[in-house]
C-alpha cells in the first residue's frame, strides 16, 4: 500500500522533460547563453512567400518568432542543443536533418515555425550567428561558451540580406 502511494505521488520524467520544466532555474552562478529566432526578412519579401504560409499565424507581424531568451549552458552544449531546448520549451515547430543523414556531419535545420528552406524564394533558408559572426560550419559543431548570443535568422537571399557575406570557405560579419 505504501509503495502504491509513493508511486502515485511521484512524477517520473526523462532527463529532457526535467530540464524543460526547470529551464527557468537560472541562478546567479549559472553559465548562460541567449538565443533569438527571427524571420523579419520575410516581411520584405512577401511576394516570394509560399502561399500556404500567408494564411494563419506562421509569420509574426514583427518577424520575431522567439525574442532574446536566456538559457542555462550545460557542459558541451552546442548551438543546436540550445535551439532544440528553446523550441521544445516554447512549443515552436522545428524540423532538422541529423548529422548522420548528410555529408556535412552536422545537424541541418530544415525549418522553424513551418518556415523552411525555399519557403520564401530559391535562396531562402535558416542561418545562425554567434556574437554577430556567421560560422562556416554546422550548428551541432559549434560548442558554446558562457555569455554568448545566438541568433537564428531567416534569409531570403543566401545570407546577403542579413549581413552574411559568403567568401569561399570563410564567412564574415
Regions flagged by a language model, labelled:
Residues 1-173:
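Ubiquitin-like/PB1-type beta-grasp interaction modules and other compact soluble beta-rich domains
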Amino acid at each position: 500500500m505504501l509503495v502504491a502511494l509513493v508511486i502515485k505521488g511521484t512524477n517520473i520524467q526523462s532527463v529532457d522533460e526535467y530540464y524543460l520544466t526547470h529551464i527557468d532555474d537560472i541562478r546567479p552562478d549559472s553559465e548562460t547563453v541567449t538565443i533569438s529566432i527571427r524571420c523579419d526578412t520575410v516581411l520584405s519579401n512577401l511576394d516570394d512567400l509560399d502561399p500556404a504560409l500567408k494564411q494563419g499565424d506562421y509569420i509574426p507581424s514583427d518577424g520575431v518568432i522567439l525574442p532574446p531568451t536566456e538559457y542555462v549552458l550545460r557542459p558541451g552544449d552546442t548551438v543546436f542543443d540550445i535551439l532544440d531546448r528553446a523550441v521544445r520549451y516554447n512549443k515552436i515547430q522545428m524540423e532538422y536533418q541529423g548529422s548522420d543523414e548528410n555529408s556535412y556531419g552536422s545537424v541541418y535545420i530544415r525549418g522553424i515555425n513551418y518556415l523552411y528552406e525555399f519557403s520564401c524564394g530559391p535562396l531562402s533558408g535558416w542561418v545562425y550567428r554567434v556574437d554577430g559572426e556567421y560560422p562556416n560550419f554546422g550548428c551541432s559543431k559549434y560548442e558554446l561558451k558562457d555569455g554568448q548570443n545566438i541568433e537564428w535568422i531567416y534569409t531570403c537571399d543566401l545570407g546577403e540580406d542579413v549581413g552574411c557575406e559568403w567568401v569561399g570557405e570563410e564567412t564574415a560579419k
